[in-house]
């Protein structure tokens, strides 16, 4: 897709599906990627304001078409681009999550938090990670949760009575 075709498809999704959450995967430093190409990537991220993104530095995978291409982007440049990209992605991810502050959302509780054994965690219908004050009897249940804090990668909340 061209940038304009991509934007058109993105806008169609946003305008057709209320509340849709859109994430993406982005590789930086692909063979032949120029600074202009990278800036185009940043432009798209700024335009789309993704709910989240999985970002990676290009690395060769044997047998793929790109493994036969010259890996001409220096590692330091790949690292710089990844850092710059992540700053932008994280900003929009946090802003997306902050829209849920004080909102009540449904969460499918999956298990015990790895960071706090007094909390459980689960996911909203748009796959946002929520850490919840609550006991293990909530696991495998869908519960209504009021969002109390928002970060780039997760939300915190309490079960609504």
Language-model-derived ranges and their functions:
Residues 68-161:
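Terminal RNA-binding accessory module
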Residues 1-52, 60-77:
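Conserved non-cysteine loop/helix-boundary elements of the Radical SAM core domain that shape
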């Amino acid at each position: 897709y061209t940038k304009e075709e991509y934007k058109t498809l993105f806008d169609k999704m946003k305008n057709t599906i209320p509340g849709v959450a859109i994430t993406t995967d982005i590789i930086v430093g692909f063979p032949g990627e120029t600074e202009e190409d990278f800036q185009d990537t940043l432009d798209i991220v700024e335009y789309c304001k993704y709910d989240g993104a999985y970002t990676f530095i290009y690395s060769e995978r044997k047998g793929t078409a790109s493994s036969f291409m010259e890996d001409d982007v220096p590692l330091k440049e790949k690292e710089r681009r990844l850092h710059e990209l992540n700053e932008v992605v994280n900003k929009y991810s946090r802003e997306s999550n902050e829209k849920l502050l004080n909102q009540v959302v449904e969460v499918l509780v999956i298990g015990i938090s790895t960071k706090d054994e007094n909390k459980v965690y689960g996911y909203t219908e748009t796959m946002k990670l929520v850490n919840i004050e609550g006991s293990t009897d909530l696991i495998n249940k869908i519960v209504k949760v009021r969002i109390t804090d928002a970060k780039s990668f997760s939300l915190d909340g309490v079960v609504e009575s």
